[in-house]
From Swiss-Prot:
Keyword RNA-binding among UniProt keywords: no
Glycosylation sites (chain numbering): N122
Effect annotated for changing T124M: In CMT1B, CMT2I and CMT2J; CMTJ2 patients present Adie pupil; slightly reduces intercellular adhesion; does not affect targeting to the cell membrane; affects glycosylation
Species in which this protein is naturally found: Homo sapiens (Human)
Tissue distribution of the protein: Found only in peripheral nervous system Schwann cells.
Any one annotated GO CC term: myelin sheath
Signal peptide segment: 1-29
Descriptive protein name: Myelin protein P0
Amino acid sequence: MAPGAPSSSPSPILAVLLFSSLVLSPAQAIVVYTDREVHGAVGSRVTLHCSFWSSEWVSDDISFTWRYQPEGGRDAISIFHYAKGQPYIDEVGTFKERIQWVGDPRWKDGSIVIHNLDYSDNGTFTCDVKNPPDIVGKTSQVTLYVFEKVPTRYGVVLGAVIGGVLGVVLLLLLLFYVVRYCWLRRQAALQRRLSAMEKGKLHKPGKDASKRGRQTPVLYAMLDHSRSTKAVSEKKAKGLGESRKDKK
C-alpha cells in the first residue's frame, strides 16, 4: 500500500450484514429418512420407506429418486423417479417390472414396493428428495437382505423378552398391592374391634357404679327393716316374760 493511501478495512455495516447472513439466517437443508435395513423372503415383496423434512411447503416440483447399488458393486443405477406428479420406472435393470409407487408427496412420503424378491436384489437403495427451493441435503440409504425365509429379528426377540419381563413385574406389583390392601383392611378391622372392646371396658365400671348406687338405698332399707323387726320381737319376748312373772 502506498503511503498516504486510504485504508481499505471493511466497514462496520458490511461486517454486520455478513454476520446476519451467515448466523442469523442459516440455510436449512432438506433431511431424508429411510430404514437402516429391511429383510425379505424370496418371492415376497418389501416396502422401501422414504420420508423427508423440509423447511418449505411441499412444492409442485417435488421429486423423488431411487438408486440401487448391488451387493459388492461400485456403481449405483437409477431405478425409479417421481416428478411433476408422475412416477417413472427406469427401463434399465431388473426392477423395471417389479417396482410399485406407494408414496404420497402431500404426506412427504416417497416409498416404493419391490415385488417378487430374488437373491440378486441384495444391495443398497438410496432415496433422494428435492423440494424446490429446498434442494440441498443428504440422501438416505437402506440395505435390503433377501433370505429364503425371513429370520426373526433380534429387535423383535429383544422386544418380546422385555415385554415378558415387564408383564411379570406388573403382575408381581399387582399381587403385592392386593395382598397389602387385604392386610391393611384386616388390620383396620382388628383395630376397630380393639377400640370397641376398650370402650366397653371403660363404660362397664360406670354401669356397675350406677348399679351399686341404686342398690345402696335398698340395702339400707332392708337393714333398717331387719333391725325394727328384731326390736319388735325383743319387746314381745320381754312382755311375755313379765306377764309370766305377774301370774306367778
